[in-house]
Amino acid sequence: MAKWLNKYFSLGNSKTKSPPQPPRPDYREQRRRGERREQPPQAVPQACSASSASCGSAAACFSASSGSLPDDSGSTSDLIRAYRAQKERDFEDPYNGPGSSLRKLRAMCRLDYCGGGGGGDPGGGQRAFTAAAGAAGCCCAAAGAGAAASSSSSSGSPHLYRSSSERRPTTPAEVRYISPKHRLIKVESASAAGDPPGGVCSGGRTWSPTTCGGKKLLNKCSAEETGAGQKDKVTIADDYSDPFDAKSDLKSKAGKGESAGYMEPYEAQRIMTEFQRQESVRSQHKGIQLYDTPYEPEGQSVDSDSESTVSLRLRESKLPQDDDRPADEYDQPWEWNRVTIPALAAQFNGNEKRQSSPSPSRDRRRQLRAPGGGFKPIKHGSPEFCGILGERVDPTIPLEKQIWYHGAISRSDAENLLRLCKECSYLVRNSQTSKHDYSLSLKSNQGFMHMKLAKTKEKYVLGQNSPPFDSVPEVIHYYTTRKLPIKGAEHLSLLYPVAVRTL
């Protein structure tokens, strides 16, 4: 038994194994088709004449030229033959297959050539086909190129079905080009247009291709409010005209009175340009400058001194309360960039003196302003520049009466006082290392800084690079508007004094 299995399945011996052989092709189908082509085509016209007696020699010529599917018989079953026939229809050649447009066109040319000389048609060989009667007019419209070719095989088996390309009725050669239904032309309706004899349309507004006198028309049902149904015609010039090539004369006759709520972009731009030009001309006629008198109401010209006094009073009352600039500086309001600095320290006794004296911000602005009315370009590194002005210090007041002088306090006490204050807050105290020197304690973004105010030859110097001053209040007053000459504090100034807290 083992020997028989080994010999039968060729187990363990690769030399006796034969390579797999490809399946032998079945040429019986090709032989049947060859025999079918050699047979004379007399049976096909008879079948066509049995279905329709009015076809004549044209249908016989068409059926003989297009051929038919083979009628398989014998060992092949009806189901297999139906499957093969349907497979040929599904995978047919788009150019040379039985349902292709090129083959239909050739069949129509053969029909026209075969039936042109006969006298069967009363019109001398010219047949009028319409889009609605193309499928039921004559036998040539009912028998398409692919349908006539497969008439014998489809009638013999109940499993054969027509493909989608063969279900459509073919269009004869005499019918003009019919565009698809989704490509339509909007025809402008005119009130003076009459009813064409092509047909009557009812309802709202419809689009339908019709034929009238051998010419293709596009009809649109006008609105019912105009009375009877009116249709406008657009004639296609030749066989190959598309709907967008058709030109309507009614479009040029229609006036501009109709407004559909749509405007071309060019027209909209032109209207906007015209509107802007009118607005600019209107503003030029007014002649009002925006920034001459920003807080004055529009009124008539001043005629008397009393009216001028009233207007001046009104103008002063409308000025901002926290603005200390004079009224003549309102010619350039975009230069208003002053920052209001809140005083964190307690007010000292010289409030009346500070109010009577001119504001340092005003003096600073007038110094920076050029004679021509503009601002001088000042660099950030120059000593004249200061982004934020510190609180004013009166250098004439002695050191012991200044609010930022705390006397003999330690470094830790000074840091505790500066801890809750903002950056650039400062105070002055006695130095712990020298009896005649003082220390300036400053809060920066990195912590606390303690700088020495040393006394040399009756002069006071801050650090090593500052100029000499006669008193400590002069040093503090000088660096409220300038940057400190201390390494690590080049960007800082003395802005916020820390006042002495009295219990």
Swiss-Prot record:
Organ and tissue specificity: Expressed in heart, liver, brain and kidney (at protein level).
Chain intervals with Basic and acidic residues compositional bias: 244-256, 313-328
Keywords per UniProt: Angiogenesis, Apoptosis, Cell membrane, Cytoplasm, Developmental protein, Differentiation, Isopeptide bond, Membrane, Phosphoprotein, SH2 domain, Ubl conjugation
Low complexity: bias regions: 147-157
Annotated segments matching region Disordered: 1-49, 61-81, 147-180, 225-262, 292-333, 345-381
GO function term, MF aspect, one: phosphotyrosine residue binding
Membrane topology: Peripheral membrane protein
Induction of synthesis: Up-regulated by okadaic acid and genistein.
Pfam families attached to this UniProt entry: SH2
Keyword Membrane attached: yes
UniProt PTM comment: Phosphorylated upon PDGFRA, PDGFRB, TCR, IL2 receptor, FGFR1 or VEGFR2 activation.
Residues annotated as domain SH2: 404-498
GO CC term, one of those recorded: cytoplasmic ribonucleoprotein granule
Residue stretches of biased makeup (Polar residues): 301-311
Cross-link (Glycyl lysine isopeptide (Lys-Gly) (interchain with G-Cter in SUMO2)): K186
InterPro entries noted in UniProt: SH2, SH2_dom_sf, SH2_domain_adapters, SHB_SH2
GO BP annotations listed: angiogenesis; apoptotic process; B cell proliferation; blood vessel development; blood vessel morphogenesis; hematopoietic stem cell proliferation; hemopoiesis; negative regulation of oocyte maturation
Modified positions (Phosphoserine) in chain numbering: S101, S301, S311, S382
Localization, UniProt: Cytoplasm; Cell membrane
Protein function: Adapter protein which regulates several signal transduction cascades by linking activated receptors to downstream signaling components. May play a role in angiogenesis by regulating FGFR1, VEGFR2 and PDGFR signaling. May also play a role in T-cell antigen receptor/TCR signaling, interleukin-2 signaling, apoptosis and neuronal cells differentiation by mediating basic-FGF and NGF-induced signaling cascades. May also regulate IRS1 and IRS2 signaling in insulin-producing cells.
Subunit structure and binding partners: Interacts with phosphorylated 'Tyr-720' of the ligand-activated receptor PDGFRA via its SH2 domain. Interacts with the ligand-activated receptors PDGFRB, FGFR1, KDR/VEGFR2, IL2RB and IL2RG. Interacts with EPS8 and V-SRC. Interacts with GRB2 and GRAP. Interacts with CD3Z. Interacts with tyrosine-phosphorylated LAT upon T-cell antigen receptor activation. Interacts with PLCG1. Interacts with ZAP70, LCP2/SLP-76, VAV1 and GRAP2. Interacts with JAK1 and JAK3. Interacts with PTK2/FAK1. Interacts with CRK/CrKII. Interacts with IRS2. Interacts with PTPN11.
PANTHER family registered for this protein in UniProt: HEAVYWEIGHT, ISOFORM A, SH2 DOMAIN-CONTAINING ADAPTER PROTEIN B
UniProt note: domains: The SH2 domain preferentially binds phosphopeptides with the consensus sequence Y-[TVI]-X-L and mediates interaction with PDGFRA, PDGFRB, FGRFR1, IL2RB, IL2RG, CD3Z and CRK/CrKII.
Protein name in UniProt: SH2 domain-containing adapter protein B
Organism whose genome encodes this protein: Mus musculus (Mouse)
